Amino acid sequence: SGMGDSGHREDYSPELYGKEILSVAEDSGFFEIGDPIICGHSMGGFMSATAGYISDKRIGGVIMVDSPIRPPTYDYSTHVRSGPIRRIKTYPDRESILERFRLTPEQDCENEYLVKYIAEWSIKEANNGYQWKFDDTIFDKLGFSHMLRNIAFELDCKLGVIYGTESNMMTDEILTFIQENVPPGTPMVPIKKAAHHVLLDQPLELAETIKGIAKKWI
């Protein structure tokens, strides 16, 4: 909720998102097929881990893609913000709003057609113009910067970590902290020539990496 064509809520929480993920899996019949594997990128990785943690049904595993689990000693003065901070406004036409589309955190992407595709599906007509679809209060309500993120270390199911080698979110400090705290044998797979938005930089390699991890778990 709060993103794309989904509705907006008065409040958001990791537990709420975890329940939403599990509800989708339940409604789609995934639990009837086997133990589902949940995969999420960035903030979605933390919500996927929450889903795996709170589920009362067996989960095949959780794969987190470029989700920075920061150590207690992390210096937030150097923190790269990834959430939208500007309030939504109305643009007069499609062209002007699409020109404003940016990845957050900002990065270059050679696959411009993918960025363009996402931008075109991120807008809606409103107030005699165009607006972004996302809930611009979501990060205020979620309290994301203060929430517990190391829940991934406490999962009963398997865990996988994928990250972009050029990601400014996955620093050496963060990668070392994750490596030292995940269960033995946890796959930590780097994707070369990929920044934080791994799916946009290396979509095919990411898909193959996810499938490779999943096949070893099934």
Question: Each PLM stretch: what is its role?
Answer:
Residues 1-39, 208:
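Active-site loop/oxyanion-hole signature of alpha/beta-hydrolase fold enzymes
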Residues 1-4, 69, 195:
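Alpha/beta-hydrolase active-site loop signature
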Residues 5-12, 73-76, 172-173:
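Conserved catalytic-core motifs of eukaryotic protein kinase domains, centered on the activation segment
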Residues 40, 44, 48:
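Gly/Ala-rich beta-loop-alpha elbow adjacent to hydrolase catalytic centers
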Residues 49-53, 60-94:
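Flexible "cap/lid" loop of the alpha/beta hydrolase fold
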Residues 88, 92-146:
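Conserved alpha/beta-hydrolase catalytic His-Asp/Glu region
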Residues 124-181, 187-190:
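Conserved serine/cysteine hydrolase catalytic core
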Residues 191-203, 207:
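Catalytic histidine-centered segment of alpha/beta-hydrolase-like enzymes
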